């Protein structure tokens, strides 16, 4: 039994220290596939997940969102190692790739 407690303690501490290194940031910059590709190229970015934010329609389709009828925006969730890349660097990547004065088409849209 004491070995199980020791193993549990080691695994629990390892898991906490690993997850403490990771952070999440969300960006909406038009076509999420273009935004996704831009962030995936950065060292320290672990994963980029596309999805939707806001809106009035529950579980909208891509077609519904792109027609502009749902109020949703295409967004990406960026999971990154904050010991390798800073949030500021992620923001710089975002601002370099969008036009903040264009509300309807960003990146390669």
Describe each region flagged by the PLM.
Residues 3-13:
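Sec-dependent N-terminal signal peptides
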Residues 2-3, 19:
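Bacterial Sec-exported substrate-binding components of ABC uptake systems
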Residues 16-109:
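Flexible coil/turn and secondary-structure edge motifs
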């Amino acid at each position: 039994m004491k070995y199980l407690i020791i193993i549990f303690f080691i695994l629990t501490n390892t898991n906490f220290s690993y997850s403490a290194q990771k952070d999440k940031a969300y960006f909406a910059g038009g076509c999420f596939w273009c935004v996704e590709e831009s962030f995936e190229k950065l060292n320290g970015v672990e994963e980029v997940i596309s999805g939707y934010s806001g809106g009035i329609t529950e579980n909208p389709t891509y077609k519904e969102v792109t027609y502009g009828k749902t109020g949703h925006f295409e967004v990406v969730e960026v999971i990154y190692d904050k010991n390798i890349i800073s949030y500021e660097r992620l923001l710089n990547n975002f601002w370099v790739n969008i036009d903040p004065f264009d509300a309807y088409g960003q990146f390669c849209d």
